[in-house]
A protein has these predicted regions:
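Conserved catalytic cores of phosphodiester-cleaving nucleases, focusing on short active-site segments
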Residues: 85
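Catalytic DNA-binding helix-loop module of base-excision-repair DNA glycosylases/AP lyases
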Residues: 75
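Portal/gating segments that form or line small-molecule/metal binding sites
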Residues: 72
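Basic, Lys/Arg-enriched alpha-helical interface segments
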Residues: 1-69, 78-81, 89-118
């Protein structure tokens, strides 16, 4: 039997999310990349949480580091891609309203694109 690689879903980086991720410490970036690879392969991230208050299908990958908590917010409900909506360093127990607004505005762009394709 041939050992086949899984077909990976495309990652679509919204806004500045890729540049924001690149600002994370190296080991956090590496862990985020591995967790995104798991999503691309059809698996769940190791530590994730649904974020229904931000939109249907929005989820976050939770990354911990001695320098703080980091988040990768994504949408994986569409077959063509995993949309990375936002990446940020979480500084308080609750997600800041500013971070939520960024996610909502980028999610609206995706929703409008999907409506126009129907």
């Amino acid at each position: 039997m041939l050992n086949q690689q899984p077909r990976l879903r495309r990652i679509a980086w919204m806004g500045s999310s890729f540049d924001d991720l690149r600002q994370f410490p190296e080991d956090v970036r590496r862990d985020a990349g591995f967790q995104l690879y798991r999503l691309q392969s059809g698996l769940e991230a190791a530590d994730w949480k649904a974020m229904p208050q931000l939109g249907r299908g929005v989820e976050e990958i939770r990354l911990r580091h001695f320098s703080g908590a980091y988040r990768v917010i994504y949408l994986a409900r569409f077959a063509e891609a995993i949309y990375v909506l936002h990446c940020f360093n979480k500084k308080t127990r609750r997600t800041a309203e500013h971070e939520k607004q960024i996610v909502r505005s980028r999610l609206r762009v995706i929703q409008q694109e999907h409506r126009s394709q129907k």
